[in-house]
Amino acid sequence: MGAKSVTASSSKKIKNRHNGKVKKSKKIKKVRKPQKSISLNDENEVEILPSRNEQETNKLPKDHVTADGILVLEHKSDDDEGFDVYDGHFDNPTDIPSTTEESKTPSLAVHGDEKDLANNDDFISLSASSEDEQAEQEEEREKQELEIKKEKQKEILNTDYPWILNHDHSKQKEISDWLTFEIKDFVAYISPSREEIEIRNQTISTIREAVKQLWPDADLHVFGSYSTDLYLPGSDIDCVVTSELGGKESRNNLYSLASHLKKKNLATEVEVVAKARVPIIKFVEPHSGIHIDVSFERTNGIEAAKLIREWLDDTPGLRELVLIVKQFLHARRLNNVHTGGLGGFSIICLVFSFLHMHPRIITNEIDPKDNLGVLLIEFFELYGKNFGYDDVALGSSDGYPVYFPKSTWSAIQPIKNPFSLAIQDPGDESNNISRGSFNIRDIKKAFAGAFDLLTNRCFELHSATFKDRLGKSILGNVIKYRGKARDFKDERGLVLNKAIIENENYHKKRSRIIHDEDFAEDTVTSTATATTTDDDYEITNPPAKKAKIEEKPESEPAKRNSGETYITVSSEDDDEDGYNPYTL
């Protein structure tokens, strides 16, 4: 009874305090109801009571998926140019298959019985066996276990640098030669096989046929790394659609081509970026798994591909060093222009200028192909420690690279960030092709770190014994390759890269058109000149007699004029230290 009276009295006091209304319990109910609704369906709660920011964002066009499964990116801006949600960059390689996969070195297959041997699970005690038979079985098992251990050891040594498998250069007398051979092995390891080239050729041919089927006046051209043989395994393919009449970059045409490719089962994971400065379609070709980017009515990439191939022909060692630097930056996520990294064209320009301005190459003291190791270390030293990013820009003069002060480049003035990389576009002097590489400080640190790592590794292995060198890698200190196991087959000489052939044909056709236009203009001009000459001849015939009558009066002034000319010239000689423009 006492307990009941206490609880009753306490409840009365609470009612008296709130004038007989239990406000506290009502408040709890009001708070709990929206919490339950949010936890059950947050989206409905947001839709009922949107905030001011959400109301503003709802007014903007949203990314959406069309009925045929095409992702339309409406919010892309000029800053998003070059970004790829699958690769992160137009020239950013993806491992094949696309799912993340640990690198596997080429090794002998380990069968189920051998795995059991390694785990010692196959041993069955047989009472009828003699001691000799058991000894033989034990010896055989030990041999098999030893072989398995050797194979596993090889796999461990080559997890991150599989290009050294069966390519031992540890007995080289000069460490620089060891690094040179290892660079060549790496380039051969990642170079395309015949099958890869044929797959890419077939993929482009199929896409081109589909484009021409949709637009008979259009054509598909390849540019970028595939058209120059500077692509890494899994790199995407950059294409451009050009037409006789132009205007294919419109929003409707982007959707039309995307839908057309999807209906023909030539495109999956399709994205249409219509509002960027460079409208583009991104998709994956399902049969090959290759990522493809298609732009419209822009030929500057085709022009750049021709120029780069000329550089490759004239510059020994350019391809090898470019592929090494590309893989180096890719492994560190510094090759994505969208995040401030270095693009493919910028990398090529850096290596090209480095080789063409190297003093020992200019004087023919060294062959670049035989000194790739030293050149790679010096490249990292130049752009990691010594290059003046604050003041110096890279340009070209008569087709050769030059350094010049940033302050004299009016197109990039005013310079907002002095510590930046400035590379003049060889095809457009007003264009800075590296303006998007705002993360140059991290790139410089990476280059400097690579120089330190390589030099330290060279000193370490130089003092090591040949036994300790076995299975070691110099290049592996700065280069990591994680992807599908490959063979050491550079089969570019066995099959033609159609992208290169078609690019060359494009330029030949264009040069013929320009030549024909110039020839037509010259023909019209020469015809007009010939007609004018005949008319002038008929008109000037009568005054010819007057010239004979005036011969004698003109002879005396001629002498005076020659004397005046002589005096004038002699005075100029005194002023210009003997220079006479008339006598040269």
Swiss-Prot record:
Amino-acid positions noted as binding Mg(2+) in the UniProt annotation, renumbered to this chain: 236, 238
Impact reported for residue 504 to A: In TRF4-502; lethal
Result after altering residue 381 to A: In TRF4-378; lethal
Subcellular location: Nucleus
Coiled-coil ranges from the UniProt annotation: none
Location of the region described as Disordered in the Swiss-Prot/TrEMBL record: 1-63, 81-147, 525-584
Cofactor: Mg(2+); Mn(2+)
CDD domains cross-referenced by the UniProt entry: NT_PAP_TUTase
Compositionally skewed regions (Acidic residues) per UniProt: 130-139
Pfam families the record matches: MTPAP-like_central, PAP_assoc
Residue ranges with Polar residues bias: 1-11
GO molecular function: 5'-deoxyribose-5-phosphate lyase activity; ATP binding; metal ion binding; mRNA binding; poly(A) RNA polymerase activity
Name the UniProt record assigns to this protein: Poly(A) RNA polymerase protein 2
Organism of this sequence: Saccharomyces cerevisiae (strain ATCC 204508 / S288c) (Baker's yeast)
